[in-house]
């Protein structure tokens, strides 16, 4: 017998190496690893031990076979091997054992394949004939027999099939083999019949479900079979039910696959809110608020952000950005291609500026030969007038601006839309504050100046004084080597007016003013108002192109179709060229003075662009209010008391006047009293204005307008007072007085008398009594006092007693002696002064 290793023996006997080593050790054969060899003597000893102990080795193998539907079967194969041989046949049996085991495994695998072909087995079948054969074989001891107790098949639900298949062996008789084959055939024929019956029942159930309108049976998801395996089987090993079937449990996924961060491209536009930015980046708004907080900005999810802040947030969170061009629509609509048109020379647009009452409108009146000043309240121009004047040498368009300081913005607007500025300075007054402002506006707009020294006909006129004062402000005349023309004029007599017009036309020739006379018109809104029966009326100065009746126009946030046009004389016209002032009707609302006017071919685009501009204005207003709230929060820290507010509802005749008054009133606000214009508009005072005034306790002010009948009745019922004004001086002065009335009175101390201590007496009742002489004013018994020593206050209190000789006195006048007892103070010395004062209320003024 050749030597064999432990590993080879374990492989032949289908045993684990460790288990075989333990078994060898129990038999007294010491081996430590699978590479150790077994000698023939050790092999003989091993076989003797096995035969003497009649050792039995049992192995079990479980396999799973899937069936259709929701079921599967478990096939359990058990092998028992008992060796009972005669001593002389042990060696040969041991050598043949691996071959017998291999044959047995092949037979079992064939049987398992047959079982896998069966879809379902629901009952236990026992092979009685195989058991009888087994008993016969156990009785035969003479021949070595390796018995296989067979395999057991466990199906779901808990259906078991046990069958015993005997292994082929050289010592088995032919009758035993035939009996074994018959038993195996019988077992599997019964299994096939059972499976066929089960399939027939399943088909009947499916057909019934289809007839009943049901969906029938669904094929089970392979992923669900493992979940259902433990829940569907509720039978014991004898086939009895243990309980009701449980519903399949939904198992939670224990591991979430990590997702790679997505880098998004965010489109950022001006005024984007925190919530919109969060939505574009697919994050929560709270995360962006945290980022802003870390950047030192306190914000809410509805707050608007500027583009720079939004860019920082997007970069901080690891995304990319693109800037949204908000002006794309505006550029596409408003930019007009005029390359195919020719330019022509146009009339100059001249703005007359100067101080109030220096004769601007009178000069223009003389030029136009009309009495415009007679129609102005108080002789003061309240809003811009646009006029076109034809002279022998050409046409000139004049813009007359107010001279009052309240109309600074209107003067600036006139300077922006003008070519030449005529600066009117009175020869008797010289340079005044509004004159300096007019110079600043003209220089800021880089507009050439022509100085008209007016009122030259007066005896006190001094033109040299005017020239020297203007030279100090860098307005150098040509006679001094500068570039500014000075013309002495008189609006009353007409002296020098022709020379002034000639100087203006000469300056316009130097400028070479040109414009396009064809194409879509462009211009600027000079003034706007709301007229009863006509609607919104806008005074427009055409700068380029040809404005025609019926054109679709866009003025700021208002749009419409030109229904009618009137020139400066009130006549209807069909078209207007460059440098022509016209009044137009047909806008959707009253535009703001200074807005650009453009003609757009498509009315739909004009409406869309107007809505976009309106939205921009709202967002800008909200952003400004937010910044003001933040600044006010820090400015009001530590301030005591509440700020008084004077609420005003302002109505005017024209847009420019309302705007100027609004700015002037807002400038009156102080830390203690604030002017709040809660509503302003153009046109008559209506009942809605009265209702708003009642709700907000506001004052209603009308400038060159009156209340309608419905508003008057409602005002009488609710007790609302209207204040009408025609001159802006009176309006501002009255508002100042009203604001002063809201101021809390100021408390001031006033010294009413001083008494000098000449001698000190002692009294058992009052303590120290000062004998005094009143040297100033009067000393009163009830007023507070201060004790001064060397002009330093050492005590402040009240008088306990005041006597003249032995009698009590309520007051002692200057030059008289008296006795004064100071309450709770006895350290009065000779030479001290007792100062008597009183606290009075003084009304504050702005």
Curated annotation (Swiss-Prot):
Q: Show the segment(s) annotated as G1.
A: 354-361
Q: Name one GO cellular component term.
A: cytosol
* Highest taxon, organism lineage: Bacteria
Q: Where does GTP bind?
A: 354-361, 400-404, 454-457
Return the SUPFAM superfamilies for the record. Initiation factor IF2/eIF5b, domain 3, P-loop containing nucleoside triphosphate hydrolases, Putative DNA-binding domain, Translation proteins
Q: Which UniProt keywords apply?
A: Cytoplasm, GTP-binding, Initiation factor, Nucleotide-binding, Protein biosynthesis
Molecular function GO labels: GTP binding; GTPase activity; translation initiation factor activity
Chief place where the protein resides: cytoplasm
Q: Which sequence ranges are marked TM in the entry?
A: none
The UniProt record lists the keyword GTP-binding = yes
Span list, region G3: 400-403
Has UniProt tagged this entry with the keyword Cytoplasm? yes
- Tell me the segments the record calls region G4: 454-457
Region of interest (G2), ranges:
379-383
- Stored InterPro entries: DNA-bd_dom_put_sf, EF-G-like_DII, IF2_II, IF2_N, P-loop_NTPase, Small_GTP-bd, T_Tr_GTP-bd_dom, TF_IF2_bacterial-like
> What are the start and end residues of every segment in region (G5)?
490-492
Query: Where does the record say this protein resides?
Result: Cytoplasm
Q: Which family does it belong to?
A: Belongs to the TRAFAC class translation factor GTPase superfamily. Classic translation factor GTPase family. IF-2 subfamily.
What does the UniProt record say this protein does?
One of the essential components for the initiation of protein synthesis. Protects formylmethionyl-tRNA from spontaneous hydrolysis and promotes its binding to the 30S ribosomal subunits. Also involved in the hydrolysis of GTP during the formation of the 70S ribosomal complex.
- HAMAP family in alphabetical order: IF_2_B
Name the UniProt record assigns to this protein: Translation initiation factor IF-2
Q: What organism does the UniProt record list as the source?
A: Francisella tularensis subsp. holarctica (strain LVS)
């Amino acid at each position: 017998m050749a030597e064999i290793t432990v590993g080879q023996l374990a492989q032949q006997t289908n045993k684990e190496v460790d288990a075989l080593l333990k078994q060898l050790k129990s038999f007294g054969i010491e081996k430590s690893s699978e590479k150790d060899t077994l000698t023939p003597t050790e092999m003989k000893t091993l076989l003797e031990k096995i035969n003497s102990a009649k050792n039995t080795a049992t192995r079990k193998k479980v396999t799973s076979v899937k069936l259709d539907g929701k079921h599967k079967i478990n096939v359990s194969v058990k092998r028992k091997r008992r060796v009972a041989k005669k001593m002389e046949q042990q060696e040969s049996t041991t050598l043949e054992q691996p071959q017998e085991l291999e044959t047995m495994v092949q037979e079992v695998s064939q049987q398992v394949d047959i079982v896998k072909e069966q879809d379902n087995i629901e009952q236990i079948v026992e092979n009685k004939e195989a058991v009888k054969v087994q008993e016969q074989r156990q009785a035969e001891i003479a021949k070595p027999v390796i018995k296989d107790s067979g395999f057991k098949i466990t199906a779901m639900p808990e259906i078991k099939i046990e069958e015993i298949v005997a292994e082929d062996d050289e010592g088995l008789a032919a009758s035993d083999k035939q009996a074994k084959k018959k038993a195996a055939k019988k077992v599997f024929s019964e299994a096939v019949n059972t499976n066929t019956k089960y399939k027939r029942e399943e088909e009947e159930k499916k057909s019934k479900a289809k007839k009943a309108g049901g969906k029938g049976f669904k094929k089970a998801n392979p992923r669900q079979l493992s979940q259902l395996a433990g829940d569907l089987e509720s039978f014991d090993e004898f086939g009895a039910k243990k309980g009701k079937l449980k519903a399949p449990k939904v198992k939670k996924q224990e591991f979430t696959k990590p997702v790679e961060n997505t880098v998004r491209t965010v489109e950022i536009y001006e005024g984007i809110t925190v919530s919109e930015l969060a939505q574009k980046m697919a994050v929560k708004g709270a995360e962006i608020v945290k980022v802003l907080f870390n950047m030192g900005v306190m914000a809410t999810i509805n707050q608007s952000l500027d583009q720079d802040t939004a860019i920082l947030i997007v970069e901080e969170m690891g995304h990319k950005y693109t800037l949204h061009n908000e002006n794309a629509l505006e550029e596409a609509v408003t930019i007009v291609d005029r390359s195919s048109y020719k330019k022509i020379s146009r009339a100059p647009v001249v703005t007359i500026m100067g101080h109030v009452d220096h004769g601007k409108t009178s000069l223009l009146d003389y030029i136009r030969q009309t009495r415009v000043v007679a129609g102005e309240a108080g002789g003061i121009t309240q809003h811009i007038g646009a006029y076109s004047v034809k002279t022998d040498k050409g046409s000139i368009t004049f813009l007359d601006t107010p001279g009052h300081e309240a109309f600074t913005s209107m003067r600036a607007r006139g300077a922006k839309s003008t070519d030449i500025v005529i600066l009117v300075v009175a020869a008797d007054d010289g340079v005044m504050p509004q004159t300096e402002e007019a110079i600043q506006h003209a220089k800021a707009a880089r507009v050439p100046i022509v100085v008209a020294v007016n009122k030259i006909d007066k005896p006190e006129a001094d033109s040299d004084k005017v020239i020297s004062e203007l030279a100090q402000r860098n307005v150098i005349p040509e006679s001094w080597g500068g570039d500014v023309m000075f013309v002495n004029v008189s609006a009353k007599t007409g002296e020098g007016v022709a020379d002034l017009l000639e100087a203006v036309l000469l300056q316009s020739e130097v400028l070479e003013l040109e414009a396009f006379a064809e194409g879509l018109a462009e211009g600027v809104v000079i003034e706007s108002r709301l007229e009863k029966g006509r609607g919104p009326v806008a005074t427009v100065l055409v700068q380029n192109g040809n404005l025609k009746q019926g054109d679709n126009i866009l003025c700021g946030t208002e749009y419409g179709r030109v229904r009618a046009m009137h020139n400066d004389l009130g006549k209807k016209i069909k078209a207007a060229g460059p440098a022509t002032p016209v009044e137009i009707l047909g806008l959707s609302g009253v535009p703001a003075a200074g807005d650009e006017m453009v003609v757009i071919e498509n009315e739909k685009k004009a409406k869309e662009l107007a809505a976009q501009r309106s939205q921009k204005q709202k967002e800008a207003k909200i952003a400004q209010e937010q910044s003001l709230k933040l600044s006010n929060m820090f400015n009001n820290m530590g301030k005591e008391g509440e700020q008084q507010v004077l609420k005003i509802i302002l109505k005017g005749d024209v847009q420019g006047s309302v705007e100027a008054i609004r700015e002037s009133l807002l400038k009156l606000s102080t830390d203690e009293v604030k002017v709040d214009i809660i509503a302003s508009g153009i046109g008559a005072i209506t009942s809605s204005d009265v209702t708003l005034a009642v709700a907000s306790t506001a004052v209603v002010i009308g400038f060159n307008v009156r209340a309608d009948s419905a508003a008057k009745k409602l005002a009488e019922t609710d007790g609302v007072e209207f204040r009408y004004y025609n001159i802006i001086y009176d309006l501002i002065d009255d508002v100042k007085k009203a604001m002063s009335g809201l101021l809390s009175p100021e408390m001031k101390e006033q010294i009413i008398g001083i008494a000098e201590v000449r001698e000190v007496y002692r009294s058992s009742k009052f303590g120290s009594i000062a004998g005094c002489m009143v040297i100033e004013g009067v000393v009163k018994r009830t007023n507070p006092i201060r004790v001064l020593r060397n002009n330093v206050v050492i005590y402040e209190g009240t008088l306990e007693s005041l006597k003249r000789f032995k009698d009590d006195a309520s007051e002692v006048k200057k030059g008289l002696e008296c006795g004064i007892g100071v309450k709770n103070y006895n350290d009065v010395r000779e030479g001290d002064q007792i100062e008597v004062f009183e606290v009075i209320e003084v009304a504050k003024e702005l």
